[in-house]
Amino acid sequence: ISFIFLASCSVEEQIQQEPDILDDIYFTEFMPCKAGPDFNAENMTAMISEWQKLITAEELLGVWGYAPAADTNSVKDTGWWELQWSSQDAANTAWDQWMQNDRANAWQEKYASVLQCDGEARNPFDAVIPIVPTAYGETNDSGYFYSEVHICEFNEGYSKDDAIEFL
């Protein structure tokens, strides 16, 4: 008895193309905030929980809160609320809607003794993030992280486009 055994193998090489992170430019606003007399973890948790229920803008891509790590930092006791939007137009529209929202105004009044943020003093800029979020490992369970900011200005004759090209 003769057997013929045929085997065929196929190696299909798949190359997963990662998106170019430099293609994403976010409109980001930093809003200064001051802790009030009723500022504590419990009140902040309640405040944020209620705030999340008020947010309807899908263009709001991310929000982070920053508290000073030391009283020697450049902004003293000012905390920051970072809002990351899909565009400046989306941010402006959402802010207009927020200002006209009776529930949002009631929320602000309710938590005025916990945290006071100055929406008029928002510091806007375009953000390009040249690293993937997991570049330094997985995010810890607490959600806390350290960040540091260095303010720079473009040299004469250079622009944002030159900086992005450099990245």
Task: Name each model feature, range by range.
Residues 1-7:
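Bacterial N-terminal signal peptides
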